């Protein structure tokens, strides 16, 4: 992607976390985790990187380290709602591109951010962009915490699911049909793992929270299914590099601290 193609990175950060309280402020090598995320994101081609926080303590921690941050309402139901408010606060135009980088991804690859932003610069018919990576184990294919995505020939998402999709009709019901090295698989097929990074047009992001929730979204607990349900297209970048580990638990935090020297 040309680094001249403009976009803004927004990083939602919420202080409350069931499994890891005060997660955005967790210390990693002497810096709050959300600052690590912002610094990684700033290595992309983004014009600016902004943290959208629900608590003044996050804003203060970011500003102390030179990271732009906004205080948003604390009662937002989702990160998308928080980002929609941030778009308003920043005065972004409807066609401006926004990339949503999660605040618990201190190992995010800046090149992935660029690639997901580039999807919307290249695809005027898409309202959203995201990323995926080939699944390389039967365990991940079966794991409901590993979200799968199926694409069409144009690289647009057909569907996202926690189930192992697609399913091979002739395989025994109730058993896993795919594993690495599986024979009889159509040429070019590989199951894909969804990576939780998104690009949006700011106008769509403002409207998204007002769209009625989709039945599929409610069943799968996957917010992106709302966009598909209402007829919006999601372009998908398939990366050859496995994504960096996110931080959801104390064990994840210790692993990242080891990797980043803290």
UniProtKB/Swiss-Prot annotation:
Pathway: Nucleotide-sugar biosynthesis; CMP-3-deoxy-D-manno-octulosonate biosynthesis; CMP-3-deoxy-D-manno-octulosonate from 3-deoxy-D-manno-octulosonate and CTP: step 1/1; Bacterial outer membrane biogenesis; lipopolysaccharide biosynthesis. It catalyses: 3-deoxy-alpha-D-manno-oct-2-ulosonate + CTP = CMP-3-deoxy-beta-D-manno-octulosonate + diphosphate. Its main location: cytoplasm. Belongs to the KdsB family. Pfam families: CTP_transf_3. It is an enzyme of class 2 (transferase). This is 3-deoxy-manno-octulosonate cytidylyltransferase. InterPro entries: Cytidylyl_trans, KdsB, Nucleotide-diphossugar_trans. Its EC number is 2.7.7.38.
């Amino acid at each position: 992607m040309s680094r001249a193609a403009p976009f803004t990175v927004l990083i939602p950060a919420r202080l409350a976390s069931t499994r890891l309280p005060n997660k955005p402020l967790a210390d990693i090598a002497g810096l709050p985790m959300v600052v690590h995320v912002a610094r990684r994101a700033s290595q992309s081609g983004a014009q600016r990187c902004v943290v959208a926080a629900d608590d003044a303590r996050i804003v203060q921690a970011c500003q102390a380290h030179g990271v732009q941050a906004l205080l948003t309402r604390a009662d937002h139901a989702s990160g998308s709602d928080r980002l929609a408010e941030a778009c308003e606060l920043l005065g972004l135009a409807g066609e401006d591109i926004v990339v949503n980088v999660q605040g618990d991804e201190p190992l995010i690859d800046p090149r992935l951010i660029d690639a997901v932003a580039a999807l919307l610069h290249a695809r005027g018919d898409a309202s959203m962009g995201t990323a995926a990576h080939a699944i390389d184990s039967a365990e991940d294919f079966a794991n409901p915490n590993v979200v799968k995505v199926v694409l069409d020939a144009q690289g647009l998402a057909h569907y996202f699911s926690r189930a192992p999709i697609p399913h091979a009709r002739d395989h025994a019901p109730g058993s896993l049909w795919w594993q690495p090295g599986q024979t009889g698989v159509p040429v070019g097929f590989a199951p894909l793992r969804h990576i939780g990074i998104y690009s949006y047009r700011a106008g769509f992001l403002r409207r998204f929270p007002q769209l009625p929730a989709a039945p599929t979204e409610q069943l799968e607990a996957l917010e992106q299914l709302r966009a598909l349900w209402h007829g919006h297209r999601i372009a998908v970048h398939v990366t050859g590099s496995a994504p960096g580990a996110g931080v959801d638990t104390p064990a994840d935090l210790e692993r990242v601290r080891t990797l980043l020297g803290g």
